[in-house]
């Protein structure tokens, strides 16, 4: 359950930012999740709520946005957002070098591909109360 570890990092980063800004409370934040990251949103929300108890983050509104996965072809430069199934998504999360096993460039047929977007997790907005 890597959602708990992710939530710990997010809570720690948000609390640190709140301290630096002199905030009494963090009222709202938006997390952007890459769709290839393989994060279960409801588990992440649960972990965030639990880890926020008794902190300036408790009760904050949590908004989650998804970033579509994007793949780029090193051969012709074409970029697209492929449709991948859950098995492929999980494999790509842990071993992105397996991308050529699942996809070919729809323009030139190359397997020389790279993930250009849809990986990672970041706080994309934050509202504080001072």
Question: What residue ranges belong to the model's regions?
Answer:
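N-terminal, polar/charged subdomain of small-to-medium soluble alpha/beta proteins
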Residues: 1-28, 36-52, 56-130
């Amino acid at each position: 359950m890597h959602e708990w570890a992710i939530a710990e990092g997010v809570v720690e980063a948000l609390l640190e930012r709140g301290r630096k800004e002199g905030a009494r409370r963090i009222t709202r934040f938006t997390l952007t999740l890459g769709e290839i990251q393989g994060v279960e949103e409801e588990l992440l929300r649960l972990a965030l709520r639990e880890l926020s108890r008794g902190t300036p983050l408790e009760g904050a509104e949590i908004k989650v946005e998804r970033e579509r996965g994007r793949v780029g072809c090193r051969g012709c430069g074409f970029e697209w957002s492929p449709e991948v199934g859950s098995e492929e998504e999980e494999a790509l999360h842990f071993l992105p070098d397996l991308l050529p096993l699942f996809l070919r460039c729809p323009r030139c047929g190359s397997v020389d591909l790279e993930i250009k977007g849809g990986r990672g997790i970041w706080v994309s907005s934050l509202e504080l109360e001072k």
